[in-house]
Amino acid sequence: MRIIENFNEFGEWGMTWRDGELVGFINGEEVVRRHLPADPLPTTLEIAADDTELRAGEKDTVRVILRALDQGGNVLSFFDDPVEVSLQGPGRIVGPSLLSFKGGAVGVYVEAGNEAGHLTLSATCRPFGTQRITFNVT
């Protein structure tokens, strides 16, 4: 057990947090830069699909990841709000339509139907409103 002589060693109650920036280098060359806001706020609902081209009549399925991002583009690790997903077009959502973020992200699967056309996945979450992604089914 360690006795802490300076009680403020790990920060003071009510201290001010400031924005920060992390820069990563490999062999002296900058490879990544991250802005870390002092007060991260839910700013962007990112929708990322593994593919946007699907084949009809083959039960072709794609994974879609939803991420809650702050104003610096960082995942909000403690964000756990519900998100409602819906699909328009010749296909279906595999699983429930009401999901909860875990660690700032949640996944959903979209399956193409038997007809060609376009699928539009909509995701609605309180801080972000509604975001959409479209798939082409051939």
From Swiss-Prot:
Keywords: Glycosidase, Hydrolase
InterPro entries in the record: Glyco_hydro2_dom5, Ig-like_fold
Keyword Ligase: no
Gene Ontology MF term list: beta-galactosidase activity
Catalyzed reactions: Hydrolysis of terminal non-reducing beta-D-galactose residues in beta-D-galactosides
EC identifiers of the protein: 3.2.1.23
Record family assignment: Belongs to the glycosyl hydrolase 2 family.
Full protein name: Beta-galactosidase
This protein's encoding gene: lacZ
